[in-house]
Amino acid sequence: MRYEKPQRGRLREHLQLNCDIFGATGRSGEIEILQLITHLMKSFGATSEHFEVLINDREIVNTVFNELMKVDEETSYKLYKIIDRAKKVSPEALDKMINELSLEESSVKILKDYLGSKSFESLFSFLDSHGKLEMVSGFKELADIASKIGLSDYLVYDPTIVRGLDYYTGIVFEVFDKNPENRRALCGGGAYANLLKIFNENPVAGVGFGLGDVTLTDF
């Protein structure tokens, strides 16, 4: 149950399927979760014409904000909120929100170049041009593995996927319906390295996703 205004794809009462992997090393857990969600969608008869998995990595976003733009923690937090809303507002509204932060002109250019990176290739080219490609080698490894095992038909890099929850530390992703009449996220998730510290002083890394029955019914 959740207390909010009922609307298409969101009801107060709903069922949610959660799948998580704990303690996996390297990128293995992330790859397995991506395989699982893709296989789950395909088991419903969906193909790459029906859905896509939009993916990003919090380490990439942090690299852009902290290493390239060199903004402070408060501004970084505001930027996360702005990018999270990027798909829901007009380009003019997005520019207005960015301008209200009074960023340096060079930082605005870096941000817009980053937001213009809409494929794995363009992202890696952007980071390489700033000498930061090695800082996201793990994400490049994930993209390479995904390509080798046949996930590349479903995975799409999207710089605006950041997920609003602060506990994500690695990949973040959302499964999107490609139907123009229901262009929305069906489910989402990501990797979190420190969340379980609230239960155990020794952190256990996790990665997973949640899928609601309401959005799945509309698919």
Question: For the regions a protein language model found, what residue spans apply to each?
Answer:
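Short secondary-structure capping/junction motifs at helix and strand boundaries
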Residues: 45-52, 73-77
